[in-house]
Every structure is written in C-alpha cells, then in structure tokens.
Amino acid sequence: EEVQNLSAKLVEDESIKLIIVDGATGQFREEYLGRGTLASRQQNLAKFLGIMKNSAYFFNVAFLMTNQVGTDPAKQFGDPTYAVGGNIVGHASTYRLYFKKAGKKRYATAIDSPKQAVFDAEFLLTDKGIDNP
C-alpha cells in the first residue's frame, strides 16, 4: 500500500530527490515464510522493485536500497556471503556495492556496474563523516 502511494507523493512533492529503502528483501522474507511461498515472494519482490525503478526513472529521483546477505556454509573457497533475493534483486539493480568492515576500516566493492569494472574503495567512518584512511 505504501509503495502504491509513492507515485502520488512524487507528483505532489517535486522536492523529493532520493528514496531509500533499508532492508529491501527483509519485509518480503518476513511476510512470505518458507519454500512454499517462494514464488509469491519473488513475484511481489519483483513488482516492488519494478515500481521503485519506474518511479526513479519517471520522476527523476535516485533510488537506493540496502539488502541482507546470507552465508553458504558449503562454500569452501572464496567469500561465502551472497545477496538475498536472488537474480530478481541483481537484475533490478544498476549498481551493486558490497560493504564489509575490518577493524575501523570499511571496504566497498563495486561488484556490478554498467560503466566500471569491479573495484574496491577503502574508507573510514568518523564523527565528521566519511574519510580517507
């Protein structure tokens, strides 16, 4: 329901330039529990992401979403973490960044971008904001 009201809100208030959804897949995982609801969950997630992507395009706003990650305990080599939501989230995203923390340093890896190869950036979070290490 909230998502359906988004277009009306964007028409009404042209000052909105950024939409942030924290934990985009979390609500769908809570609402559609178990493997038996996987198809419904993925369909509704795809619908939500489509509405967000179209709203961003038609109303010239940036859309940023965070997502959950899972771990594959059977993976023996490499990073066992993966993005929750499968291909639907991957295909709906223009840029995908993977963040990780090591001590006080933070790392951002651009794992999918239409204009750049995979790259890493190191940064610090301080009281003043984001800073170079």
Regions found by a protein language model. Give the residues of each.
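Short, well-ordered alpha-helical scaffold segments within catalytic/effector domains
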Residues: 3, 46-49
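Residue-level preference for long, well-ordered alpha-helices that form the structural scaffold
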Residues: 37-45
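Conserved inter-motif catalytic segment of the P-loop NTP-binding fold
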Residues: 1-37
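Phosphate-binding/switch region of NTP-binding enzymes
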Residues: 43, 50-133
